[in-house]
Amino acid sequence: MSFLNIPAGRRFDLACLGRLAVDLYAQQVGSRLEDVASFAKYLGGSSANIAFGAARLGLRAAMVSRVGDEQMGRFLVETLQREGCDTTMVQVDPERLTALAILGLKDRDTFPLLFYRENCADMAIAADAIEEGFIADCRALLITGTHLSQPAVRAASTRALAHAGRHATLRVLDIDYRPVLWGLTKRGDGQTRFVPDARVTASLQEMLPQFDLLIGTEEEFAIAGGVPGDLLASLRRVREITHAAMVVKLGPLGCCLVAGAVPERLADAPTSAGERVEVLNVLGAGDAFAAGLLTGLLRGEDFASAARLANACGAIVVSRHACAPAMPTPAELAHWFGGRRGADVAADAQLAHLHRVTAPRARWDELNVMAFDHRSQFFELARAAGAPESRVPALKRLLVRAAERVEASRGLQGRMGVLVDDVYGEDALHAATGRGWWVGRPVELPGSRPLRFDGGPSLGTRLVQWPREQVVKCLVFYHPDDAVDLRLEQESRLREVWAATRDSGHELLLEIIPPRDTTDAAHADAAVLRAVQRLYTIGLKPEWWKLAPMQASGWTALAALVAARDPHCRGAVILGLNQPLDDLAKGFAAATHAIVKGFMVGRTLWAEPAREWLRGDVGDDAFIAAVATNFETLVDAWRASRPHAAASVPSPAPVHDTAQPALRPA
């Protein structure tokens, strides 16, 4: 870079020091904050948003801050870690609580904001805990303005800057002026973005010489320079104090660079035009801008390319509800710059799909799933055994224990899963959730054709109450040659499931079973493949397909279809249909293609032991042992069909798509 000296060959590209907080975003857009009924929880805080966004774009990012020793602090640390951001320097405070912000979206110009930061953890960063060796391992250090506003955090920032100066680490200030956090407004007025104040100006100017790059809006440079209403005069005052390069954010007009002397007109400075988009939420756009700008600069881009990337990141985020989770991925930016996006960002289905499937997510290279989400079958088992229906929930809790046993005996950590309903299996479902298993949960009314939803038609309302880790499983008896009215009705219901999961953030598994009365065995594979193709054609892109065993040629054809229609699909799993274990093993042997990730089998494993348990012929331990033995046999058959599957696989962890395209704007 001609205007910045950035070291190379270090462990981290960027460390961000500053606010790390929980954001609660109002879900009712257009509502007064007083009238908001529900909120969505996200990672927040300007520095944290930048670290998160930079990590998502592929930088080796790290966070320097402090959280409380409680659930919200752990949420923030885990969220950063899932994104690939280092949290070694995130201190844990045993006495203070994690910071909190509550945000509303009243209209395109009104975004009420409440900061709950009284004696919060991130304002108590211990300066002596910021290690010089850590800062020396960073190519750049970014600090946001709030952490210059109080003595304790100012001391921490000063210490980090001193370390950075000794090791030629690039020092960046995002001015991030929040008058309320400098005590200049009422505590409830977090929305006001500019209040002139000589004390703040003097405080900032004392620190400016310690930075190499300054990032700010027109108002933020006005407070830094101290000449309200005259941006050029403020920039000249800043230039008298520091040689730092200045990047001025101009909102929808883009940004400009002042690397040397301040020009007579701002238009004479190198400028990158902004993106025109419909604004939903301006909160966090500046953080997305900084993440994009620093990603470009740290990757050796010139200012024009880095600024174009920054402007795109900001434009995408202002069109979405959140800040950190709204940050784009490299795949989204490739789509953005590839000329394939629509004028309405919010309506760009492909951009939304890429955002969903290319952000880091839990990795499932293999799945060994016991399915006991059956409802009518368990009811019939109980009735045939003369047992009360009320015993079924206890039976399902025992199935979780059987799954636990097999996870341990076969080393299935990171490859274990269950399918459980919430009718008879609510307790079992709760027991399975939150332990690192793949957990699926059905929505279809058993046996319905045309498809109906169990629990009523308001699927979206139900999903709000589901843990995000649970996968929505929908079984449909579907054939592409069904009568037109039936096919269209079923496709309409499937679109509802698709739309509901896109809104809720849950993954979707579609289980496709062609009806036996219209599908002979010789054409079963073709019927399934045509069904999958048809559902792709109408716009559905589920994360998972659950299909009956096919010939090897069928799986090869499926892989080609998925690669063409949705290369980010997680893959397919084999269903059981109550087939004998030996028959399933033969099906596994034909399913060696990488598109097949595992199996989801139910009655084959537990039907006969359940019958005996419901009759009272065996006790809990014998039932668990019998089911576990069947499950182990099936796991062994799966491993025998693909020897590499027996290798140890780590627990699910976020995976970054290393095949994502480069970020360079076209």
Short names for language-model regions:
Residues 1-14, 163, 226-349:
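Conserved phosphate-binding/catalytic region of the ribokinase-like
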Residues 342-484, 582-598, 603, 607-666:
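Alpha/beta catalytic barrel-like cores
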Residues 433-444, 490-509, 556-574, 625-640:
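Alpha-helix-loop-beta-strand connector modules within alpha/beta enzyme cores
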Residues 140-237, 244, 252-261, 511-512, ...:
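Conserved beta-alpha-beta core of the PfkB/ribokinase-like small-molecule kinase fold
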Residues 2-86, 109, 125, 278, ...:
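Glycine-rich phosphate/adenosyl-contacting loop at the front of the ribokinase-like
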Residues 140, 170-172, 213, 245-247, ...:
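Structural preference for beta-strand elements that scaffold enzyme active sites
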Residues 401, 405, 457-471, 479, ...:
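Alpha/beta enzyme core
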Residues 60-145, 334-343:
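Conserved N-terminal subdomain of the carbohydrate kinase-like
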